[in-house]
């Protein structure tokens, strides 16, 4: 596998939106235990995926709590192909801060970096404060995919990371545009990619 077969993906967003849980649920779903997530123990994890018959290594970086102290620097963004911008659907402030995270991507990120907007904790339907249609409208304005996930139940977690990988593949490798699936919590996935 050469350098062009490695996609560096960042997870950013406010503290406690579930970035580390999303990372662990995606990279090690069989051993995921929400109560065991240590916010400062994860730097990055790898997972191999296949797109159009070609294997890619997703190198997924987590801020590991640094966002609380605003210590995320340009070096974190260096070489990134994609960014999952995460918020908590039960916390309006985390959604309101998405624009600030988008500005930070523009300030520090690589020109043309792929982005996906992720509303996490969609399993907490009775506590939901951020309407999916509002987030979808914002994502449409930015021209990026939007998806609601639940790291707790696993709903749409794989789909979020695959949407990111598809965006990177299309923008950096030149693959054809995939059919866009923008599921909200509870929506069954329409297509599935081959995961190794």
From Swiss-Prot:
GO molecular function per UniProt: GTP binding; GTPase activity
Any one Gene Ontology BP term: vesicle-mediated transport
Superkingdom in the source lineage: Eukaryota
Lipidation positions, renumbered (S-geranylgeranyl cysteine): 196
Lipid bilayer topology: Lipid-anchor
Residue interval(s) of motif Effector region: 36-44
Pfam families: Ras
Record's keyword terms, sorted: Cell membrane, GTP-binding, Lipoprotein, Membrane, Nucleotide-binding, Prenylation
Subcellular location as annotated: Cell membrane
NCBIfam families listed in its UniProt record: small_GTP
Name assigned to this protein: Ras-related protein RabG1
Organism of origin: Dictyostelium discoideum
């Amino acid at each position: 596998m050469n350098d062009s077969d490695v996609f560096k993906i960042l997870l950013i967003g406010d503290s406690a939106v579930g970035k580390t849980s999303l990372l662990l649920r995606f990279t090690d779903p069989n051993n995921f235990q929400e109560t065991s997530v240590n916010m400062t123990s994860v730097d990055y994890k790898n997972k191999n995926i296949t797109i159009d018959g070609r294997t890619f290594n997703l190198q997924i970086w987590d801020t590991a709590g640094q966002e609380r102290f605003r210590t995320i620097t340009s070096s974190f963004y260096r070489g990134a192909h994609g960014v999952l911008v995460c918020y908590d659907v039960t916390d309006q402030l985390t959604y309101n801060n998405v624009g600030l995270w988008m500005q930070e991507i523009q300030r520090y990120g690589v020109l043309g970096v792929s982005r996906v907007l992720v509303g996490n904790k969609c399993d907490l339907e009775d506590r939901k404060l951020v309407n999916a249609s509002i987030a979808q409208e914002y994502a449409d304005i930015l021209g990026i995919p939007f998806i609601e996930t639940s790291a707790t139940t696993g709903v749409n977690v794989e789909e979020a990371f695959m949407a990111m990988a598809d965006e990177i593949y299309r923008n950096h490798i030149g693959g054809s545009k995939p059919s866009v699936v923008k599921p909200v919590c509870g929506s069954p996935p329409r297509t599935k990619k081959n995961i190794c």
